[in-house]
Curated annotation (Swiss-Prot):
Disulphides: none
Domain of life: Bacteria
InterPro entries: AcrB_DN_DC_subdom, Acrflvin-R, Multidrug-R_MdtC
Gene Ontology CC, one term: plasma membrane
Subunit structure: Part of a tripartite efflux system composed of MdtA, MdtB and MdtC. MdtC forms a heteromultimer with MdtB.
Gene name of this polypeptide: mdtC
Recorded GO MF terms: xenobiotic transmembrane transporter activity
Protein name as catalogued: Multidrug resistance protein MdtC
Stated family: Belongs to the resistance-nodulation-cell division (RND) (TC 2.A.6) family. MdtC subfamily.
Keyword Transport appears in the UniProt entry: yes
Coiled coil: none
Organism: Salmonella typhimurium (strain LT2 / SGSC1412 / ATCC 700720)
Keywords: Cell inner membrane, Cell membrane, Membrane, Transmembrane, Transmembrane helix, Transport
Keyword presence, Transport: yes
Length: 1026
């Protein structure tokens, strides 16, 4: 009593405290960063190594395996995967959430150093690492085009100057430059000319390497001067290499230009990049795992004027893709939804209280509670994101509930003629415990979320804390500011209302009278209500089992990502044509704004595409509908497939798969994996629950298998090393020398001129110089025949792995897909030597599925404990919790009605309903207990009176929560995929709960009261001594 009086009788102090909370909140709001979702990125580091010309199997055994053994000893590694292709290996290390990325990077470098001695010689550079996840979609893509500059020159400028500058911006983790490669001097050998001159390929390589050296020459000095010695020991251009003497034939000099074409070109000619049908260099920018995407993009945009100033006029720099506009639009939509929710909630209060002054009180209390929450969010290191703003939107209904309960009870005393200050004190004292019970039990719902681990726990923690803080501030405001404003602003009123207010008043009275009549009937038919209650419990169980489930709602971010997978024997020239064909099909779609893509490198039969869609307001279809439409057109392209998926704000794992979800096969036997993977992939492709099924196991690439006759080689004076060196020199794009320039280092690349290696007959022109200096054709000691070989070799941990990726057809949930996969694996009878498990997002979904029920039960148990402590009773918390089954039925039926799967967002809605619907029971039980204690009423009379007295605040609080959540259901635009499941769950649960709990709660209250009396009578019987 004294606590409440302290604030009621000191209005200036109370107002200043509220103002201080508001000012701190405004300051926190201005300082909060902006993000699509809470920070949930796993720390990921990518290790890269190259050995030009090495086969995928060689890369896997000689490069990947030593590195994996060393990297696997690092503490905190959650998952390690690797992919080895022609000449390159990439190892992805995913660390635990609590691992610092910089500390992990130091451990990775130490592991690379430890494995260095085990790696093969001939690697052009040491393995390197990057602190970025290659499977993440770029946060921004910049393109460089030019009418006069070559692709190699553009690439050099982009990688040497632009990429270096962008990489220094805070938050940037990796700048991947694609579309070409660095400039190089390319030496295209003529095998016949070499044979005629008696010059071996090794001799050419050694001559070039010896002619281009960079060594210190020292200095000469006398007593006065000092001269630095400088020589022309370096060759920098193709024109300087052409006259190089590489051999003497009968005293005549054989120059490099006599036996080869020497051109200024690029290191790897098998690279291509395009933007909207124009050749382009792509700068794909990815953020650090812990970086804020909006702040990083803003930093890049702020740097763009400086970048454009340093670019020559012949180069055009454009932003091809930017993730930030859709994120900002989504957050703006949430903020508008929040404002609408506040307005609707205040409208509900006005309709019930029919007083402008009374409505002004919650109109002040709600903003103070919500704005004050921003200060706590800033101190906790949170961000303004979809989930935290959704928490505040839902909190609108909660925070007004506390104010409504206090305000309505004070208003009731005022209507009875009590003086304002006395009514404020008396009304607050009567409901103070009720408000505390409602708030503490609501916060208790979120305690299990705070203890939840993994990605779901990290994702929901910010939501739970934000909502809990808002409820806590609301509790303080409702017991201090609200009664103070009631005591000083409201006046005692007469029983009659003004004529213009009679309509709403009569409706409320009529509803209350109708409720009283129906409640009497219900209390006389308790068994029927009991059957209905048990039916809702059973229906909950059935609906939860039957409803489709998924991890996170599929978002429409306005960006699509596509992976091209062509025939494994396709050439680079044909692959570049496929890229152009796919880009044309996509560019012609009316919903597409921009298309960029690239192909080449170590994976000749693959490519990547990034598609920016028009803003939501300029297109009618969702991203998934556009994908469905394009899938039909793209399927008509022969010899290649393009797999499209919508870019999501959450992507788990480091696998760069061609679909959203992955199922990984592991085996210690590569042969067993290669035998069973095609069978499993074929079976999964036939499932209607899956779409775009594809695999990263590609073991049907065309290979020419050379078989050496070692006896003949020994007799001819040729060793295996010389033969392998011949093949590497001829067909491996071998980097044989380095050209040093002020801004970068470039390579001299040697291979047989493509004009002489168009088919297998090129092998017949190859020869080796034996120990006697004679030219021995390759065909003398080797036979060759075509065979199949893998284009890539993949590992997970130290086991051979193959990942089958898939998307979901429209109308199919992730739970239906995973169940179908598990059922298929059982039906196929896959041996124990091949193990299957879900990866990435599908794996997290499986883990979340296992913990969902535990989480709901833990929340209910926590609420029960809190209520039991507050009421000092084992029974009354059960009465209050009896409201939950009806809310669960309503929520699940609403999700089914809207064809929305049960996702992590819907789980949040269920958790919120646990807190919301019990408020009705708390208000009933509190007044019934008080009536029994102080009024001497029977349980039947007490609960009946409590239901009637609390009918108006129950209707007000429920409608406030309902109208607070309704804008989430009706919202459209960017980000609505996240908001709608939450709104649907809450609105459905509230409607069903309001219809049932007004009747089931009093029945359950009486049931437990009779049960209590029965047990108390048994315990009170005298003990009979025998």
């Amino acid at each position: 009593m004294r606590f409440f009086a302290l604030f009621i009788y000191r209005p200036v102090a109370t107002i200043l405290i509220a103002a201080a909370i508001t000012l701190c909140g405004i300051l926190g709001f201005r300082l909060l960063p902006v993000a699509p979702l809470p920070q949930v990125d796993f720390p990921v580091i990518m290790v890269s190594a190259s050995l030009p010309g090495a086969s995928p199997e060689t890369m896997a055994s000689s490069v990947a395996t030593p590195l994996e053994r060393s990297l696997g000893r690092i503490a905190g590694v959650n998952e390690m995967t690797s992919s080895s292709s022609l000449g390159s290996t990439r190892i992805i290390l995913e660390f635990n959430f609590d691992r610092d990325i910089n500390g992990a990077a130091r451990d990775v470098q130490a592991a690379i150093n430890a494995a260095q001695s085990l790696l093969p010689g001939g690697m052009p550079s040491r393995p390197t690492y990057r602190k970025a996840n290659p499977s993440d979609a770029p946060i921004m893509i910049l393109t460089l085009t030019s009418e006069s500059w070559s692709q190699g020159k553009l690439y050099d400028f982009a990688s040497t100057q632009l990429a270096q500058t962008i990489a220094q911006i805070d938050g940037v983790g990796d700048v991947d430059v694609g579309g070409s490669s660095l400039p190089a001097v390319r030496v295209g050998l003529n095998p016949q000319a070499l044979f005629n001159q008696g010059v071996s390929l090794d001799e050419v390589r050694e001559a070039i390497d010896s002619a281009n050296v960079r060594r210190p020459q020292g200095a000469i000095e006398d007593s006065v001067h000092r001269w630095q010695i400088q020589t022309n020991d370096e060759l920098k251009t193709a024109a300087e290499y052409q006259p190089l003497i590489i051999h003497y034939n009968n005293g005549a000099a054989v120059r490099l230009g006599d036996v080869a074409s020497v051109t200024d070109s690029v290191q790897d000619v098998r690279n291509a990049g395009m933007t909207n049908a124009k050749p382009a260099i792509l700068l794909m920018i990815r953020k650090l795992p812990e970086a804020n995407i909006i702040q990083t993009v803003d930093g890049i945009r702020a740097k763009l004027p400086e970048l454009r100033a340093m670019i020559p006029a012949a180069i055009d720099l454009q932003i091809a893709q930017d993730r930030s506009p859709t994120i900002r639009a989504s957050l703006q939509e949430v903020e508008e939804t929040l404002a609408i929710s506040v307005a609707l909630v205040i409208l509900v209060v006005f309709l019930f209280l029919r007083s402008g002054r009374a409505t002004l009180i919650p109109a002040v209390a709600v903003p103070v509670s919500l704005i004050g929450t921003f200060a706590a969010m800033y101190l906790c290191g949170f961000s303004l994101n979809n989930l935290s703003l959704m928490a505040l939107t839902i909190a609108t209904g909660f925070v007004v509930d506390d104010a409504i309960v206090v305000l309505e009870n004070i208003a009731r005393h005022l209507e009875a003629g009590m003086k304002p200050l006395q009514a404020a004190l008396q009304g607050t004292r009567e409901v103070g415990f009720t408000v505390i019970s409602m708030s503490l039990s609501l916060v208790a719902v979120f305690l299990p979320l705070l203890l939840m681990g993994g990605l779901p726990g990290r994702l929901l923690r910010e939501f739970a804390v934000t909502l809990s803080v808002a409820i806590g501030i609301s509790l303080v405001v409702s017991l201090t500011l609200t009664p103070m404003m009631c005591g000083w602003m409201l006046k005692s009123s007469k029983p009659r209302t003004q004529p213009r207010k009679r309509g709403v008043g009569r409706l409320l009275v009529a509803l209350q009278q109708g409720y009283g009549t129906s409640l009497k009937w219900v209390l006389n038919h308790t068994r029927l209500v009991g059957v209905v209650f048990l039916g809702t419990v059973a229906l909950n169980i059935w609906l939860y089992i039957a409803i489709p489930k998924t991890f996170f709602p599929e978002q429409d971010t306005g960006v699509l990502m596509g992976g091209i997978q062509a025939d494994q024997s396709i050439s680079f020239q044909a692959m570049r044509g496929k890229l152009q064909d796919f880009m044309k099909i996509i560019r012609d779609d009316p919903a597409v704004n921009n298309v960029t893509g690239f192909t080449g490198g170590s994976r000749v039969n693959s490519g990547m595409m990034f598609i920016t869609l028009k803003p939501r307001g300029e297109r009618k279809e969702t991203a998934q509908q556009i994908i469905d439409r394009l899938r039909v057109k793209l399927a008509k392209e022969p010899g290649a497939r393009l797999f499209l998926m919508a870019v999501q704000d959450i992507r788990v794992g480091g696998r760069q798969a061609n679909a959203s979800y992955q199922y990984t096969l592991l085996s210690d036997s590569l042969a067993a994996l290669r035998e069973w993977e095609p069978k499993i992939r074929k079976a999964l492709s036939a499932l209607p629950q899956l779409a775009d099924v594809n695999s990263d196991q590609q073991d049907n690439g065309a290979e020419m298998n050379l078989i050496y006759d070692r006896d003949t080689m020994s007799r001819l004076g040729i060793d295996v090393q010389a033969a392998n060196s011949l093949l590497n020199n001829a067909f491996g794009q071998r980097q044989i020398s380095t050209i040093y320039q002020p801004m970068n280092q470039y390579k001299v690349v040697m291979e047989v001129d493509p004009r002489y290696s168009q088919d297998i007959s090129a092998l017949e022109k190859m020869f080796v110089i034996n120990r006697d200096g004679k030219a021995i054709p390759l065909s003398y000691f080797a036979q060759w025949r075509p065979a199949n070989a893998p284009l890539s070799v993949n590992h997970q941990g130290l086991s051979a792995a193959s990942t089958i990726a898939f998307n979901l057809p429209t109308g199919t949930s992730l739970s239906q897909a995973t169940e179908a996969i598990n059922r298929t694996m059982t039906q196929l009878g896959v041996p124990s030597t091949v193990r299957g498990s879900f990866s990435g997002t599908a794996q997290v979904f499986q883990q979340t599925m296992n913990s969902q029920l535990i989480l709901i039960v833990a929340a209910i148990a926590t609420v029960y404990i809190v209520l039991g402590i507050l009421y000092e009773s084992y029974v009354h918390p059960l009465t209050i919790l009896s409201t939950l089954p009806s809310a669960g039925v309503g929520a699940l039926l609403a999700l089914e009605l809207f064809n929305a799967p049960f996702s992590l967002i819907a789980l949040i809605g269920i958790m919120l309903l646990i807190g919301i619907v019990k408020k009705n029971a708390i208000m009933m039980v509190d007044f019934a207990l008080e009536a029994q204690r102080s009024g001497g009423l029977t349980p039947e009379q007490a609960i009946f009176q409590a239901c009637l007295l609390r009918f108006r605040p129950i209707m007000m609080t429920t409608l406030a929560a309902l109208f607070g959540a309704l804008p989430l259901v009706l919202s459209g635009g960017d980000g609505s995929e996240l908001r709608q499941p939450l709104g649907i769950t809450i609105v459905g649960g509230l409607v069903m709960s309001q219809l049932l709990t007004l009747y089931t709660t009093p029945v359950v209250y009486l049931f437990f009261d009779r049960l209590r009396l029965r047990f108390s009578r048994k315990n009170s019987k005298p003990v009979v001594e025998i």
